[in-house]
């Protein structure tokens, strides 16, 4: 039994005897009973169920007078390990008693094997010992419907969790105002505590859902969850996600996808999220403000870098539902790279302004500030990108105009203040 609480039953030899594989089957196939072997004996109580921390007084009584099977020659094993002789005492010539205190939880959900042996090691009788806790009421029930065709729910066993006993969980559901109780049948679909209802679900009518837990020491029932299928809809990840460059812009990528086809016949809205990361990183950056668009431009990216992009969908407002939907899984990653930068880096031979030329430092600083702010956000708003494109167009036009002016002026007067001719 696990060392959750210490007790004499936990003390035993370190190496189990060769009979262990056979003993592990006793509580599954049935422990030996009177008349099952050459030496007949009975263990009492038979297959007890006890709370953790309880004590047990068991006896092994030999029937008849088989040679070598007197009480003085008997001994006990628990899960294949011989128990210390000081835990036993002879009651009479044919009965050996065993006292175990402060029992730990069972090491096997099917019960621990308590076996009475003759002097030569043969098995006389066995009993299954169940030590654990009653179940607590299940909590944290959550459910979702894939494209309004089914319902999947999962839960957690309770605050304490482990009972050390086989505990059966049943998910029950019914229409709120009428109908009979139904029991979910497809368990463990998305984890150990989950169940899937594949069909025959009603829309526009609330359901009541709860979970019942039962084991040898008792039962518990969760609180009732009331939900409408339309309020817990999720869907498949957006298909056909495409990521491409935005012309020669070295810090941007364009992302496009299509709406979930499974919901094309239903009146609903959708919210989308995008996340992206660089090729050699595991950290994702999430873009939340995509709203109901099916395209987005990521900005503030690193030039000459491979990015992985994923998209997911949250359908909401189906048939007028007021509640937010449930996010789908992320789409499969799609990769694309930004163009390499053609601008020289620090110390890379950038031309400094010639003496007397007007410096474009203030404009460059302002642009740098704008781009620095943009890199902190990945905007998917068309207005934001129109503004950004206008900014770039204005800079190019301003630069071109300045170059034309400088080409008209005589070389001696370039960069000087313009004023009325004297």
Curated annotation (Swiss-Prot):
Tissue-specificity statement: Highest levels of expression observed in spleen, thymus, lymph node, appendix, bone marrow, stomach, placenta, heart, thyroid and ovary. Strongly expressed also in fetal lung.
Subcellular compartments: Secreted
A GO molecular-function annotation: cytokine binding
InterPro entries named among the record's database cross-references: FN3_dom, FN3_sf, Growth/epo_recpt_lig-bind, Ig-like_dom_sf, Ig-like_fold, Type-I_Cytokine_Rcpt
Residues that carry a glycan: 92, 104, 140, 168, 292, 382
Disorder noted: Crisponi/Cold-induced sweating syndrome 1: An autosomal recessive disorder characterized by profuse sweating induced by cool surroundings (temperatures of 7 to 18 degrees Celsius). Patients manifest, in the neonatal period, orofacial weakness with impaired sucking and swallowing, resulting in poor feeding. Affected infants show a tendency to startle, with contractions of the facial muscles in response to tactile stimuli or during crying, trismus, abundant salivation, and opisthotonus. These features are referred to as Crisponi syndrome and can result in early death in infancy.
Coiled-coil spans in chain: none
Any Gene Ontology CC annotation: CRLF-CLCF1 complex
Location of the motif WSXWS motif: 327-331
Record domain Fibronectin type-III: where: 137-232, 237-341
Cystine crosslinks: 143-153, 184-195
Descriptive protein name: Cytokine receptor-like factor 1
Family: Belongs to the type I cytokine receptor family. Type 3 subfamily.
Keyword Signal: yes
Induction cue: Up-regulated in fibroblast primary cell cultures under stimulation by IFNG/IFN-gamma, TNF and IL6/interleukin-6.
Signal peptide span: 1-37
All copies of domain Ig-like C2-type, residue ranges: 38-131
Keywords: Disease variant, Disulfide bond, Glycoprotein, Immunoglobulin domain, Phosphoprotein, Receptor, Repeat, Secreted, Signal
């Amino acid at each position: 039994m696990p060392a959750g609480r210490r007790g004499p039953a936990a003390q035993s030899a370190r190496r189990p005897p060769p009979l262990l594989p056979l003993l592990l089957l006793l509580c599954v196939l049935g422990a030996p009973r009177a008349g099952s072997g050459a030496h007949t004996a009975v263990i009492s109580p038979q297959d007890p169920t006890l709370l953790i921390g309880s004590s047990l007084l068991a006896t092994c009584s030999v029937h008849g007078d088989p040679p070598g099977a007197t009480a003085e020659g008997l001994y006990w094993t628990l899960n294949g390990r011989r128990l210390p002789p000081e835990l036993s005492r002879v009651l009479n010539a044919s009965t050996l008693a065993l006292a175990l205190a402060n029992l730990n939880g069972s090491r096997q959900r099917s019960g621990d094997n308590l076996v009475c042996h003759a002097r030569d090691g043969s098995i006389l009788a066995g009993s299954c010992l169940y030590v654990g806790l009653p179940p607590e009421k299940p909590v944290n029930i959550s459910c979702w419907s894939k494209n309004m065709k089914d319902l999947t729910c999962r839960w957690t066993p309770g605050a304490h969790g482990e009972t050390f006993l086989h505990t059966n969980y049943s998910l029950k559901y019914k229409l709120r105002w009428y109908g009979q109780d139904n029991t979910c049948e497809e368990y463990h679909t998305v984890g150990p505590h989950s169940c899937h209802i594949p069909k025959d679900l009603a829309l526009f009518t609330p359901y009541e859902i709860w979970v019942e837990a039962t084991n040898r020491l008792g039962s518990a029932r969760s609180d009732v969850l009331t939900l409408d299928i339309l309020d817990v809809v999720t869907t498949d990840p957006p298909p056909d996600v495409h990521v491409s460059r935005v012309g020669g812009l070295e810090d941007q990528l364009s992302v496009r996808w299509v709406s979930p086809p499974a919901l094309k016949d239903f009146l609903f809205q959708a919210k989308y999220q995008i996340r992206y990361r660089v090729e050699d990183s595991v950290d994702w950056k999430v873009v939340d403000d995509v709203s109901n668009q099916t395209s987005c431009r990521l900005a503030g990216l690193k030039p000459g870098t491979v990015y992985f992009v994923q998209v997911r969908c949250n359908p909401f407002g189906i048939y007028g539902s007021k509640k937010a939907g449930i996010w789908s899984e992320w789409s499969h990653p799609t990769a694309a790279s930004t163009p390499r930068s053609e601008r020289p880096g620090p110390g890379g031979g950038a031309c400094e302004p010639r003496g007397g030329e007007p410096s474009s430092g203030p404009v460059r600083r302002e642009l740098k500030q704008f781009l620095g702010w943009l890199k902190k956000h990945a905007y998917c708003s068309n207005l934001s990108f129109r503004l950004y494109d206008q900014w770039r167009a204005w800079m190019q036009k301003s630069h071109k105009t300045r170059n034309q002016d400088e080409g008209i002026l005589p070389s001696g007067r370039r960069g000087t203040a313009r004023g009325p001719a004297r």
